[in-house]
Amino acid sequence: MTDRTAAATRETAETEIEVTLDLDGDGESTVDTGIGFFDHMLEAFAKHGLFDLTVRCDGDLDIDDHHTVEDIGIVLGECLADALGDKRGIVRYADRAVPLDEAVADVVVDVSGRPRFYFDGAFSQPYIGEFTSDMARHFAESLALNAGLTLHLSIEGENAHHEVEALFKALARSLDDATRVDDRRSDTPSTKGEL
């Protein structure tokens, strides 16, 4: 199997970001975004997706968390697309429902090369520490659009911490499933011959 790793950087007036990703890792992570709860979610994403992930971000948190969260989604999406290469042999489709106490998140993904994003639900509280709850949706959208994913997400619950954490874990599990190499397949999983 080819090496399915990638690294990317992004530097703007708002953020300076470095990300590395290994799709065939062990779930190890080193994350420093400046937002404690977001660090926790990215660590959970790596752990439950079995991705090795490093994220370092110096963002304009004196303003708010928007640019940091959005730009990390962009760079992680770029890394995901780069690590997948021509997508030869991948499973392509996956879905996962993950509960956390009263909350449940459903994720359906197609590693299609046709970026689309759909979200259903609302977070129960506007903030989790210094993290704006709705930025979880925005992170997933930025990831999907830059990785070339068709991504459908839905959440239900009563506690925003649980809702967001279930969402990150379901996203990780579904991406692990969809990006996994199927030994029975040597071609790209599309009748078109490419994704």
From Swiss-Prot:
Tell me the superkingdom of the source.
Answer: Archaea
E.C. number(s) listed in UniProt: 4.2.1.19
Which reactions is this enzyme annotated as catalysing? D-erythro-1-(imidazol-4-yl)glycerol 3-phosphate = 3-(imidazol-4-yl)-2-oxopropyl phosphate + H2O
Protein name as catalogued? Imidazoleglycerol-phosphate dehydratase
Against CDD domains, the record matches this protein to: IGPD
State the UniProt keywords alphabetically: Amino-acid biosynthesis, Cytoplasm, Histidine biosynthesis, Lyase
- Cytoplasm as a keyword? yes
Organism this protein belongs to: Natronomonas pharaonis (strain ATCC 35678 / DSM 2160 / CIP 103997 / JCM 8858 / NBRC 14720 / NCIMB 2260 / Gabara) (Halobacterium pharaonis)
Family membership, please give it. Answer: Belongs to the imidazoleglycerol-phosphate dehydratase family.
SUPFAM superfamilies in the record: Ribosomal protein S5 domain 2-like
InterPro entries on file: IGPD_sf (IPR038494), ImidazoleglycerolP_deHydtase (IPR000807), ImidazoleglycerP_deHydtase_CS (IPR020565), Ribosomal_Su5_D2-typ_SF (IPR020568)
Residue ranges annotated as transmembrane are none
| GO CC, alphabetical | cytoplasm
NCBIfam families, sorted: PRK00951.2-1, PRK00951.2-4, PRK00951.2-6
* GO BP field: L-histidine biosynthetic process
Q: Which GO terms describe its molecular function?
A: imidazoleglycerol-phosphate dehydratase activity
Q: Which PANTHER family match?
A: IMIDAZOLEGLYCEROL-PHOSPHATE DEHYDRATASE (PTHR23133:SF2), IMIDAZOLEGLYCEROL-PHOSPHATE DEHYDRATASE HIS7 (PTHR23133)
Subcellular location, record wording: Cytoplasm
